[in-house]
Amino acid sequence: MLRLPAVLRQIRPVSRALAPHLTRAYAKDVKFGADARALMLQGVDLLADAVAVTMGPKGRTVIIEQSWGSPKVTKDGVTVAKAIDLKDKYKNIGAKLVQDVANNTNEEAGDGTTTATVLARAIAKEGFEKISKGANPVEIRRGVMLAVDAITAELKKLSKPVTTPEEIAQVATISANGDQEIGNIISDAMKKVGRKGVITVKDGKTLNDELEIIEGMKFDRGYISPYFINTAKGQKCEFQDAYVLISEKKISSVQSIVPALEIANSHRKPLVIIAEDVDGEALSTLVLNRLKVGLQVVAVKAPGFGDNRKNQLKDMAIATGGAVFGEEGLSLNVEDIQPHDFGKVGEVIVTKDDTMLLKGKGEKAQIEKRIQEIIEQLEVTTSEYEKEKLNERLAKLSDGVAVLKVGGTSDVEVNEKKDRVTDALNATRAAVEEGIVPGGGCALLRCIPALDALKPANEDQKIGIEIIKRTLKIPAMTIAKNAGVEGSLIVEKILQSSSEVGYDAMLGEFVNMVEKGIIDPTKVVRTALMDAAGVASLLSTAEAVVTEVPKEEKEPAMGGMGGMGGGMGGGMF
């Protein structure tokens, strides 16, 4: 038997041999000051150049290679930004920081990513230049943030609320790159499901864009057996004024469903059974009665899985005024069902793939309470998947769901259009939330005079304010440049005109922006500026950058290739 010190002596050489592999990470490369900033700025420039070409009504598209499938054609700033990954680590850090600006703006406002990117580049570039001449980066950042606060207040003054469907259509049209059809379809969707209703975007099956409104509760589970079909046309099962039995558990025995069938039959009501599954004797009995006696019944599997299924079934019960059998904590058995336990609906449509419960007879107060619970969950959850599911449930309980089906001749065209529709939808929601300001970069130009009233604490803060003053001209200049005209001349002319006048890049003329429908959501403009200023001014304060030195991969040895010599002779000339 070994004593402990002897065991330790044996372990020590092994630990020494392993130590380099356990403790040694990649080597690091460090750059300081102007060298580091210059390389990062090159990355910022590369990303901003690629994104800036998409800006404005005459902006161009960008083609992105994908690891699978055909290349993606897009005019969406954040999609372009996300696709960029540079080989040089220092340049990539600059690009990634501006990428974060685009992502943050997209998450918060849903649009304005291109504006945020060109603003971030302008602030970072000017900031680097002033710092290299000896200005204090921390004070410059304070000046920048001081200016941003003043502009945010000014934008609120310029903002006007969105009141009419026409204004909603105008906002959507501008964000969809001037596509009026998209603008109108989004306006219609908002009219039908309410301004806070759920609107989803999907691939269409035709050449044209379509709007489908789903009222009531629709879920993606159809009839368990085709023998339940009761219409000659359309392969579906339709009932009016039906009872709904909702069970969390599987239904297999005949005895468990006989009481429900007897009650439904005595009340002369069709019966919809929604359960985890209906099989065995229970299913064969239902099918036989349906075929021989003409029993009005249909069985459907419950949607979703796990907690999501439980929540959806509870939602259905509340919307229809029924109870959930087999629910944990409640000793409700299907055999003991009473008339008041059934959910009640005005209309039911069940197809092979989905079920729709319309005109549920649930209590308004209970439905409102359930909606409030879901809203509270939405406020605290951080998971994107959870948010999506909660929003779907919310829509089914409230005004229904509007589905925008995007049409086109090919997948590439549909995907490009889908990006624009999503942008337009997000911009419209932002406009409804915080109002609108003149578009085309004009709102930021109109905020320049507000900066003259600021009183900086020192010269370096004044430099920060001046940086923002010059940066506010960049979006309008970029839009003009993409339209093929001299940006600085256009900006000067706008500044000399009255406050409502701006440049219509599509027609190449100066117009009243709001009257012409060239408008931006206030939230989008505000978020773009705040995100750009925050990240770009931080970027300017960087004095050292640390990156990993890539490990050199050794070429694999060409072992096992011996024995090839001499055997290839004879006639090989």
From Swiss-Prot:
It catalyses: ATP + H2O + a folded polypeptide = ADP + phosphate + an unfolded polypeptide. It holds the Pfam family Cpn60_TCP1. One of its GO terms (biological process) is positive regulation of execution phase of apoptosis. One of its GO terms (molecular function) is ATP-dependent protein folding chaperone. Residues 1-26 form a transit peptide. GO terms for cellular component: cell surface; clathrin-coated pit; coated vesicle; cytoplasm; cytosol; early endosome; extracellular exosome; lipopolysaccharide receptor complex. Its main location: mitochondrion. It is an enzyme of class 5 (isomerase). InterPro entries: Chaperonin_Cpn60_CS (IPR018370), Cpn60/GroEL (IPR001844), Cpn60/GroEL/TCP-1 (IPR002423), GroEL-like_apical_dom_sf (IPR027409), GROEL-like_equatorial_sf (IPR027413), TCP-1-like_intermed_sf (IPR027410). It comes from Gallus gallus. The modification Phosphotyrosine is found at residue 227. CDD domains: GroEL. Keywords: ATP-binding, Chaperone, Isomerase, Mitochondrion, Nucleotide-binding, Phosphoprotein, Transit peptide. It is found in: Mitochondrion matrix. Belongs to the chaperonin (HSP60) family. Gene3D superfamilies: GroEL, GroEL-like equatorial domain, TCP-1-like chaperonin intermediate domain. ATP binds at residues 75, 111-115, 440, 520. This is 60 kDa heat shock protein, mitochondrial. HAMAP family: CH60. Its EC number is 5.6.1.7. Chaperonin implicated in mitochondrial protein import and macromolecular assembly. Together with Hsp10, facilitates the correct folding of imported proteins. May also prevent misfolding and promote the refolding and proper assembly of unfolded polypeptides generated under stress conditions in the mitochondrial matrix. The functional units of these chaperonins consist of heptameric rings of the large subunit Hsp60, which function as a back-to-back double ring. The gene is HSPD1.
